Amino acid sequence: MTAPIQSKMATRVAIITGVVFVIAGLPKFIGFGWEVANFTRFGLPVPEAWVIAAGVIEIGGGALLIARRWVRFSCLVLALTMAVAIVVSGLGRGDIIPSLTLAPALLIACVYLGTNPPMQR
């Protein structure tokens, strides 16, 4: 792929991935009690702290991807978050949706963006 095409593709992937992360992070605060119940079911200690951390990471990281700022750092943190989601809730508890569908797709998008970051605005 040529550089301009690659950059346009990376820009689109960054924006779309960022929007998905922001949307995924909002329920951590809007439906806090429901999310805490899920995180409790996953066997995580201090589930309230995990819910808040996940929400901040998803919304903050998603916003940085949309703005195309600190893309590699954001993708590293977001990829680690998705890896935890896959292992803890997907493989650990058998939650197919979203932990074994959306989380792996977002992990792949983060790896792509981490190795092919879009140009900053």
What is each model feature region?
Residues M1-I30, W50-V56, G60-R121:
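Extended, low-polarity transmembrane helix blocks
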Residues F32-P45:
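Membrane-interface interhelical connector segments
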